[in-house]
């Protein structure tokens, strides 16, 4: 390799098979034809070990996030978690909860050697959850409660768009009150959401007025959104300058392109889970994963934030934020373009956002919690 890489996490959509049929599924798991075609090309157990687990350490990977579809529908799901542990990786499992029994939770927890994080999706804790998911949130809440009782670490993914603007404050507050860390994922046009992007995707104005104020409030999900108005020198201080090429790490902040990467069920590699099926850097069956990273123009671009265009390229927060690369692609057709949903319009890098002080203050709280509570775990308030 020409560079040393320090990626942290692989988001692996190990299958498109699912036991639900969410109408806006990002991985098209509600489309029987797409699932059938994908099933024939799914990486086998041996291929996953050879092409992913055996090579990912070379680019710094520490965590395997197993997703789908519904990952646990794979007959080898438990074996894959055991293999990941054998190779020294921690494991997270994204699940809808429908097939995740207490016995399975215990088995996966044991297979991960106690490192397991269970991630569920809750877009709203009210009835609006059913707009974008196949049912209400009771099932996900039950899984979270069971994990809490068993001492298994928990996480929540909140898909953000027009569908939950009104309920977002209550949803995030519920997660905070229950000590559950979360990340926001923007509604995009990948998969079955393609024809509904205009209907559900948030606008710049909605991000500024409704979404961003709520995301700024809570340290539980503090690193996982854009725009991220952190004082660059503050991150440099806490991270001691740790970067994956130019992408800030320890902790990772802003856009996660460049600190994690995604692999689809068929072996295609992308810099972001939202960009799978849209941005293909190569296939692990055809080329070793480290070589894909090293030779792919896509990865070499996203790892070098000096190449960002438009206002993202003249912004004080160019490196600590990076703008959402998915929004750049879906709105402007270029993953290195400016993020058009960002409401900050700097004239040059000297201009500060009015939210920098608030962002920096809660960032310090976030760093304190992570260093004292551990990965993906925030202690519940007394």
Could you say what each language-model-derived stretch is?
Residues 1-116:
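Conserved alpha-helical substructure of the radical SAM core
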Residues 17, 21, 25-28, 258, ...:
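Cys/His-rich metal-chelating microdomains
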Residues 24, 63, 117, 181-183, ...:
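Residues at the N-termini of beta-strands
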Residues 6, 21, 60, 112-114, ...:
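Short loop/turn motifs at secondary-structure junctions
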Residues 1-4, 274-382:
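Flexible mid-to-C-terminal extensions adjoining Fe-S/redox cofactors in radical SAM and related proteins
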């Amino acid at each position: 390799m020409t560079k040393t890489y320090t990626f942290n996490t692989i988001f692996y959509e190990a299958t498109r098979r699912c036991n639900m049929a969410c109408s806006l599924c990002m991985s098209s798991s509600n489309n029987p034809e797409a699932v059938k075609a994908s099933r024939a090309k799914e990486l086998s157990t041996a291929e996953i070990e050879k092409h992913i687990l055996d090579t990912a350490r070379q680019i710094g990977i520490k965590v395997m996030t197993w997703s789908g579809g519904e990952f646990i529908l794979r007959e080898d799901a438990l074996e894959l978690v055991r293999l990941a542990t054998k190779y020294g990786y921690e494991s997270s499992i994204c699940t809808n909860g429908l097939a995740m029994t207490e016995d399975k939770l215990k088995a996966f927890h044991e297979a991960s050697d106690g490192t397991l994080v269970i991630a569920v999706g809750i877009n709203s804790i009210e009835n609006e959850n059913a707009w974008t998911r196949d049912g209400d949130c009771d099932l996900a809440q039950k899984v979270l409660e069971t994990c809490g009782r068993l001492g298994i670490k928990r996480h929540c993914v909140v898909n953000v768009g027009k569908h939950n603007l009104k309920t977002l404050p209550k949803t995030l507050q519920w997660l905070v009150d229950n000590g559950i860390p979360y990340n926001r994922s923007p509604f995009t046009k990948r998969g079955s959401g393609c024809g509904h992007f205009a209907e559900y995707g948030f606008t710049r104005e909605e991000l500024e007025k409704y979404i961003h104020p709520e995301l700024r409030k809570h340290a539980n999900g503090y690193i996982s959104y854009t725009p991220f108005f952190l004082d660059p020198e503050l991150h440099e201080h806490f991270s001691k300058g740790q970067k994956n090429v130019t992408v800030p790490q320890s902790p990772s902040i802003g856009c996660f392109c460049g600190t994690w990467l995604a692999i689809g069920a068929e072996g295609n590699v992308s810099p972001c889970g939202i960009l799978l099926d849209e941005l293909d850097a190569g296939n692990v069956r055809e080329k070793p994963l480290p070589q894909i990273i090293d030779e792919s123009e896509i990865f070499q671009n996203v790892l070098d934030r000096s190449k960002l265009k438009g206002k993202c390229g003249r912004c004080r927060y160019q490196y600590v934020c990076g703008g959402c690369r998915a929004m750049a692609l879906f709105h402007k057709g270029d993953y290195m373009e400016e993020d058009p949903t960002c409401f900050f319009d700097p004239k040059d890098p000297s201009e500060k956002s009015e939210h920098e002080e608030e962002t920096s203050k809660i960032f310090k709280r976030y760093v304190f919690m992570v260093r004292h509570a551990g990965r993906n775990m925030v202690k519940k308030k007394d």
